[in-house]
UniProtKB/Swiss-Prot annotation:
Belongs to the short scorpion toxin superfamily. Potassium channel inhibitor family. Gamma-KTx 2 subfamily. GO terms for molecular function: ion channel inhibitor activity; potassium channel regulator activity; toxin activity. InterPro entries: Scorpion_toxin-like_sf, Scorpion_toxinS_K_inh. It comes from Olivierus martensii (Manchurian scorpion). Keywords: Disulfide bond, Ion channel impairing toxin, Neurotoxin, Potassium channel impairing toxin, Secreted, Signal, Toxin, Voltage-gated potassium channel impairing toxin. Has the CSalpha/beta fold, which comprises one or two short alpha helices connected to anti-parallel beta-sheets stabilized by three or four disulfide bonds. Its main location: secreted. This is Potassium channel toxin gamma-KTx 2.2. Blocks human and/or rat Kv11.1/KCNH2/ERG1, Kv11.2/KCNH6/ERG2 and Kv11.3/KCNH7/ERG3 by binding to channel outer vestibule (S5P domain) with a 1:1 stoichiometry. Also has a minimal effect on rat ELK1/KCNH4 potassium channels. Has been shown to weakly inhibit Kv11.1/KCNH2/ERG1, Kv1.1/KCNA1, Kv1.2/KCNA2 and Kv1.3/KCNA3 voltage-gated potassium channels.
Length: 57
């Protein structure tokens, strides 16, 4: 029971960062097009193209 709780807690803590994507209104066709957009708007180059729009995280 303790092991299950620890695993569940670890998964929860690790998943916190995954849900911090910031959608933008910039259209894209590939993720590399989002890198300069994310850098200029949020200061980070982490981004991806999702459904034709850039998501920065």
């Amino acid at each position: 029971m303790k092991i299950s709780f620890v695993l569940l807690l670890t998964l929860f803590i690790c998943s916190i960062g995954w849900s911090e994507a910031r959608p933008t209104d910039i259209k894209c066709s590939a993720s590399y097009q989002c890198f300069p957009v994310c850098k200029s708007r949020f200061g980070k180059t982490n981004g991806r193209c999702v459904n034709g729009l850039c998501d920065c995280f």
